[in-house]
């Protein structure tokens, strides 16, 4: 007969720390925390969430299945997850001035897929910004579902100033007669004319959708025009400049469309929603409703302009000449550099960014002629204009050094910059 204590396994299961249960994963998390603490994060789609968001996302709500919507679930025991989801919905509506909100999309891709499922049939024509001009994979890239199942027609930017030509968009819409027109992207540094887009959509009988995943935080903070009054549907991720957990959000002012989007998410695309993530979304929306979030977003834009001007003054070309939001694209061709080589050198120097294609880029997507830089994450940790000017000079120092090297590396300069980056980040600690 066994003499083992039958309670020992459950006791360990509910009490063992991550370090005790899985030291390998614990070590990886420690390493990632160290990286975030000691590197300047300039990836435009990344941010640093609050401890409260982390706590909500790591809560016991991860245990709960809740297929359906608040008050109409397929499972019992949903009274507390209903509270969380209703708070997330109400806060999202208040934050963006929308009549309806679906907080269940697990990702940005799934929120956009839900709009397509609700509004289009396979083979239907839609318009979006070309990925090469700053659009997004889910707006009709050939490798994406949106490009495989539907018929994308892409508008682009002018060669002379790399900005969207609205007259050209109108002409293309008249020719293509799309059922849906999308504004928004992943690497467009300028403002969008939502009013004109809606007029164009109305002129051809199309729905107008805005994917504001990148600039939603700026909209919430009042430093970027809101698409919600103009669009039939607005989608956004809840991370990036909104500074929440990774996930998606669908907004509309049209009740009939809201029902379509709800059905498209569940049961159309997803089953049980991630209630721990929805709880964290609610926390992030509450944070974004506070006055200090307006200050934060104002700083994000000011810091982006400071970084852009510093790089321009150091002799670097910027796509479209600058930025109106939180991101910028550096055209590396005048320096004789490639995006992939430049990204690696900056990472070695403690500055995290990503290679990025530029409009009419002659290089392949995994090489590129550009870098994308963004200010949300470093602004969250407290960087201001002076710090971003310093970062701009450090970037220029590294890139100028590797431009003079034969192998895309400048070890002495990279090491020197990395030390100065550590001194800078030590002044702005995170998660103490």
Swiss-Prot record:
Residues marked Plays an important role in substrate specificity (site): 239
Biological pathway: One-carbon metabolism; tetrahydrofolate interconversion; Amino-acid biosynthesis; glycine biosynthesis; glycine from L-serine: step 1/1
Residue numbers binding (6S)-5,6,7,8-tetrahydrofolate: 131, 135-137
Taxonomic superkingdom: Bacteria
Chief location: cytoplasm
Cofactor(s) recorded in Swiss-Prot or TrEMBL: pyridoxal 5'-phosphate
HAMAP family in UniProt: SHMT (MF_00051)
Subunit structure: Homodimer.
Name by which UniProt lists this protein: Serine hydroxymethyltransferase 1
Gene name as annotated: glyA1
